[in-house]
UniProtKB/Swiss-Prot annotation:
<feature type="transmembrane region" description="Helical">
    <location>
        <begin position="649"/>
        <end position="669"/>
    </location>
</feature>
<feature type="binding site">
    <location>
        <begin position="527"/>
        <end position="529"/>
    </location>
    <ligand>
        <name>glycine</name>
    </ligand>
</feature>
<comment type="function">
    <text>NMDA receptor subtype of glutamate-gated ion channels with high calcium permeability and voltage-dependent sensitivity to magnesium. Mediated by glycine. This protein plays a key role in synaptic plasticity, synaptogenesis, excitotoxicity, memory acquisition and learning. It mediates neuronal functions in glutamate neurotransmission. Is involved in the cell surface targeting of NMDA receptors. Plays a role in associative learning and in long-term memory consolidation.</text>
</comment>
<dbReference type="GO" id="GO:0035235">
    <property type="term" value="P:ionotropic glutamate receptor signaling pathway"/>
</dbReference>
<dbReference type="GO" id="GO:0055074">
    <property type="term" value="P:calcium ion homeostasis"/>
</dbReference>
<keyword id="KW-0325">Glycoprotein</keyword>
<dbReference type="InterPro" id="IPR018882">
    <property type="entry name" value="CaM-bd_C0_NMDA_rcpt_NR1"/>
</dbReference>
<feature type="topological domain" description="Cytoplasmic">
    <location>
        <begin position="592"/>
        <end position="648"/>
    </location>
</feature>
<dbReference type="InterPro" id="IPR001320">
    <property type="entry name" value="Iontro_rcpt_C"/>
</dbReference>
<keyword id="KW-0675">Receptor</keyword>
<feature type="glycosylation site" description="N-linked (GlcNAc...) asparagine">
    <location>
        <position position="311"/>
    </location>
</feature>
<keyword id="KW-1133">Transmembrane helix</keyword>
<keyword id="KW-0472">Membrane</keyword>
<dbReference type="GO" id="GO:0050975">
    <property type="term" value="P:sensory perception of touch"/>
</dbReference>
<protein>
    <recommendedName>
        <fullName>Glutamate [NMDA] receptor subunit 1</fullName>
    </recommendedName>
</protein>
<feature type="region of interest" description="Disordered">
    <location>
        <begin position="947"/>
        <end position="984"/>
    </location>
</feature>
<feature type="glycosylation site" description="N-linked (GlcNAc...) asparagine">
    <location>
        <position position="255"/>
    </location>
</feature>
Length: 984
């Protein structure tokens, strides 16, 4: 309140001065001035002398002063009365046309006098360079429009705090600050800078508690009670020297300054007379070196004026405080040039930020030892090679609270932890206790469902990979625990939820992660995959098991189809074999037919010589050789055909041998292959209707697919198929309802080793690991990580793998099952038997067709025979009549011839050669050859013609066997009725 009242008086005084009738004169020139007055409001005569000497030396430094330019100093003494200071600035500095003012003051006199100089000079746009003022108020450019300083403000120490926390790896802190402007400024600076600072470092510090107190403390006990219940034991304090004494006094009474507690304080608090041992504090380098800051401020001003002269025209500075209309634009431009300076001075690297505050200021890190001795243990200084600030700490020189040499953990480490897990075979098996059970088995641990509001009894027992890991961890790093199951059975994912009474969406975690983020649990020991989304909100130990993502599917069925015996050859090869059989048969037939030794028989050849090969016999021969059946007949006769037959036999031998060998490979040693080749399988990337794949909703695998742009199409397809738990998905894979389940490789490899019908497809992708989850900034993170690394080195993790995941005996049985030849059964060879059955049925069918066809042919032949018999009978009747007529005519002529005693002539008769035809001989008359009567008699059937007088007995034809019912001969005139040729 006093400071605000004083500021109002300063503003009133500045207004009074502005209306004084002193008279104003403006000066503008096209050329830059050759002389420049630099004002100084200094605290003592020594500073005034040094200011005068510095400007005198500056005039001889051609690097900063152009030719024909001279600097002059105009100084006044800083008055503790700010109103007097305002009048002195107007009368003794502005009236002398000063282009800038350098101001310093005694640290004990307060900062009101520099503020008066800043107000007055700023009204006329005259730059003011402070060399001792460090209050946060001077950073407000709405008030101190032309003020910049070669010393940093107090609240810039927050930057050094962040460097120290990063160096000591402290992740959780408590900030103690006063409620004044500087106290709130340092808190704001810490929170703002940490947002960008921690983007470049691995360790992020969070503020667990903020303690704000009113200045001029009398007691700090009430705040210490809250601080003691917090987890953090690192205190960052901004307080005045007087307030720091009260805080240290009360903190000592609560034993909060001893072993395990870390205090990092600002410059003012470091000078308290009761600062505890082990406190770390900051001290600005050259903080009390007015000479160094005077020199740096003068040279910064000279550098800015030189650059401004080379770039633009500088108007003369204002000369009168009475002219309120003065607007010195050159002063505003000069202030911008000053802020852009970056030079190496006596106090280090001198540069300014947008507020005109010094940056690159160096700090000493002070460690308080016994009897309030200050010991330098580090520096925060500018690194010219990297062009940035760098922290250097000698850790071995630090004495911590309680006179400890070892760095405290910085947090209160609880020894009894709330540990959560989740059912996930083989890492965690969950068993419900029976009604008659009162305790779990020795290798099990009680694990009730986690419910903060319901103290349920231990109804479940847990065992497995993670439980054994938890038991061993608790032994190694010495903590006790209460184990509980996930409240909703999920690992957890974040959802957007509306805040009550607000329009904004808030990201909220569920499941195990949610309990850890909300600090309702201390640790998660489960197959928890490490991924970026989770690592942003919780801590992870180093992986206790490395794994990735893979695909689980059911093996293709090993049962053979009815045409399994055809598998050794491809369809193309079978077609070629079938074509080859008939082509070879055709060529054999042609070779045997056109061979001179195949078709024609020799004249002297035996009648039993084998006949030439016909086409049907050639086909039979080709098939017989191919099927290795005996060939009893129908073999090639020619040499060329027999050569081809031998070649065909060799071909058949190779084909049959190859078929037999491949048949064994397909039916006896067949090993099923996976359907999918991996995540890059085209059927997964372009999912078809008959291929379903899924994962678990909200899991790490689900998050992985969301991150991968190239898998977005696949994720959109599978999103609707995702399951709530992995157990449900695995059961559906076994039942064949789900073709591919995408999940952590450790679980799927376990399932595949347990069930020989399951197999993992393709290579691992999305490689990661399982880690122990802890709260952000948990004190157990490092201890758990180091212990897990020791477990890896000692072989303990490998032992857990063999015991719980791989199940060596089961996996060996699966491999034995895969390598054991299948015993051929009816299912394997059913096709062959069916083929034989088809052959038998075909043969029976063909014989039935043949019988039916034969019956039809017999009936047809019978009808033809009847018709032929009728025709023959009719023809016989006609011929008989013709024969009788011819016989009568011949007899008459014969009789006439006898009477004329002429020798008999030749006649042509058609007679039946035999009375009874031979078997198979066609019925009907045959044409006899022309001849005499004797010829006729010789061809007639034995008949006694002596009675008829036609043939005398002397012909010697009487020797005939007796005939019953002798029939007369039938004469036929050779199928013609013309008998004119007959000669008697």
């Amino acid at each position: 309140m006093a400071a605000a009242f004083a500021y109002r008086w300063l503003l009133c005084a500045a207004g009074i001065v502005n209306v004084l009738p002193i008279g104003a004169q403006r000066h503008t020139a096209s050329d830059n001035p050759s002389t420049y007055n630099i004002g100084g409001v200094l605290s003592n005569s020594e500073s005034e002398l040094h200011f005068h000497t510095t400007i005198a030396h500056l005039n001889f430094d051609q690097q900063y002063v152009p030719r024909k330019v001279t600097y002059y100093d105009k100084t006044i003494r800083m008055d503790k009365n700010p109103i007097k200071t305002v009048f002195n600035v107007c009368d003794k500095l502005i009236e002398k046309r000063v282009y800038a003012v350098v101001v310093s003051h005694e640290q004990t006199s307060g900062d009101l006098s520099p503020a008066a100089v800043s107000y007055t000079s700023g009204f006329y746009s005259i730059p003011v360079i402070g060399i001792s003022s460090r209050d946060a108020a001077f950073s407000d450019k709405n008030i101190h429009v032309s003020f910049l300083r070669t010393v940093p403000p107090y609240y810039h120490q927050a930057d050094v705090w962040l460097e120290l926390l990063s160096h000591f790896l402290y992740t959780k802190v408590i900030i103690i600050h006063s409620s004044d402007t500087d106290g709130r400024a340092i808190l704001g600076r810490f929170q703002t800078t940490s947002q960008t600072y921690y983007d470049d470092v691995d360790v992020r510090a969070t503020v667990e508690l903020i303690v704000e107190f009113e200045p001029k403390l009398e007691s700090f006990t009430e705040h210490l009670i809250d601080m003691k219940t917090a987890q953090s034991r690192v205190y960052l304090m901004y307080a005045s020297t007087e307030d720091a004494q009260v805080i240290f006094r009360d903190a000592g009474e609560y034993n909060m300054t001893g072993e395990g507690h870390v205090w990092i304080v600002t410059e003012q608090a470091l000078h308290a007379n009761n600062t505890p041992d082990g406190v770390l504090g900051l001290q600005l380098e050259h903080a009390h070196s007015d000479k160094g800051h005077i020199r740096d401020s003068v040279y910064v001003l000279a550098s800015a004026i030189k650059e401004m002269i080379s770039n633009e025209t500088i108007a003369e500075a204002p000369k009168d405080c009475g002219d309120s209309a003065v607007n010195w634009e050159s002063g505003k431009r000069l202030f911008q040039y000053l802020k852009s300076r970056n030079i190496t001075g006596e106090t280090g690297q001198v540069a300014f930020d947008d507020n005109g505050d010094r940056i690159y200021a160096g700090y000493d890190v002070i460690n308080i030892r016994e009897h309030q001795k200050q010991h330098l243990v580090g520096k925060f200084s500018y690194d010219s090679l990297r062009a940035k600030m760098r922290m250097r700490i000698n850790d071995s020189e630090i004495i911590w609270g309680g006179k400890q040499k070892r760095k405290p953990e910085g947090i209160m480490i609880p020894t009894h932890l709330k540990v959560l897990t989740i059912e996930e075979k083989p890492f965690v098996y969950v068993r419900r206790m029976g009604d008659d059970e009162f305790r779990c088995e020795p290798d099990e641990r009680p694990c009730p469902l986690f419910n903060a509001s319901d103290a349920t009894t231990n109804e479940f027992c847990c065992r497995g990979y993670c439980i054994d890991l938890l038991i061993e961890l608790s032994k190694r790093i010495n903590f006790t625990y209460d184990l509980a199951l996930s409240p909703d059975g999920q690992f957890g994912h974040y959802i957007l939820r509306n805040n009550t009474g607000a329009m904004t969406l808030r990201k909220e975690w569920t499941g195990l992660i949610g309990e850890l983020v909300n600090e309702r649990a201390d640790m998660i020991v489960a197959p928890l995959t490490i991924n970026p989304e989770r690592a942003e909100y919780i801590e992870f130990s180093k992986p206790f098991k490395y794994q990735g993502i893979t695909i689980l599917e059911k093996k293709p069925s090993r049962s053979s189809t009815l045409v399994s015996f055809l598998q050794p050859f491809s369809n193309t090869l079978w077609i070629l074999v079938m074509v080859s059989v008939h082509v070879v048969a055709l060529v054999l037939y042609l070779l045997d037919r056109f061979s001179p030794f195949g078709r024609f028989k020799l004249s002297h050849s035996d009648s039993n010589e084998e006949k030439a090969l016909n086409l049907s016999s050639a086909v039979w021969f080709a098939w017989g050789v191919l099927l290795n059946s005996g060939i009893g007949e129908g073999t090639p006769r020619s040499f060329s055909a027999r050569v081809l037959g031998m070649v065909w036999a060799g071909f058949a031998m190779i084909i049959v041998a190859s078929y037999t060998a491949n048949l064994a490979a397909f039916l006896v040693l067949e090993r099923p292959k996976t359907k999918l080749s991996g995540i890059n399988d085209a059927r997964l990337r372009n999912t078809m209707e008959n291929l379903t794949c899924a994962t678990v909703k909200g899991s790490s695998v689900d998050m992985y697919f969301r991150r991968q742009v190239e898998l977005s199409n696949m994720y959109r397809t599978m999103e609707s198929n995702n399951y709530v738990t992995a157990e449900q998905a695995i059961q559906d894979v076994k039942k064949g309802k789900l073709m591919a389940f995408i999940w952590d490789s450790s679980r799927l490899e376990y399932e595949a080793s347990k069930d020989c019908e399951l197999v993992t497809a393709g290579e691992l992708f999305g490689r990661s690991g399982y880690g122990v989850g802890l709260q952000k900034g948990s004190p157990w993170t490092d201890a758990v990580t180091l212990t897990i690394l020791e477990f890896h080195e000692s072989g303990f993790m490998e032992k857990l793998d063999k015991q719980w995941i791989f199940h060596g005996h089961v996996q060996q049985n699966c491999e034995l099952f895969e390598k054991t030849p299948n015993t051929l059964g009816l299912k394997n060879m059913a096709g062959v038997f069916i083929l034989v059955g088809v052959g038998i049925a075909g043969g029976v069918g063909l014989i039935i067709i043949e019988v039916i066809y034969k019956k039809h042919q017999v009936k047809k032949q019978k009808r033809l025979d009847i018709a032929r018999h009728a025709a023959d009978k009719w023809r016989g009747t006609i011929e008989k009549r013709k024969t009788i007529r011819a016989s009568l005519a011949m007899q008459r002529q014969y009789n006439v011839g006898l009477m004329a005693r002429q020798p008999p002539g030749t006649i042509s008769l058609a007679v039946d050669k035999r009375r009874y035809p031979r078997l198979g001989q066609r019925l009907g008359p045959e044409r006899a050859w022309p001849g005499d009567a004797a010829d006729v008699l010789r061809t007639r059937r034995p008949y006694d013609l002596t009675k008829s007088g036609l043939v005398p007995p002397a012909l010697g034809l009487g020797k005939t066997r007796p005939q019953q019912n002798p029939l007369p001969p039938r004469y036929s005139p050779g199928y013609t009725s013309d008998v004119s040729h007959l000669v008697v």
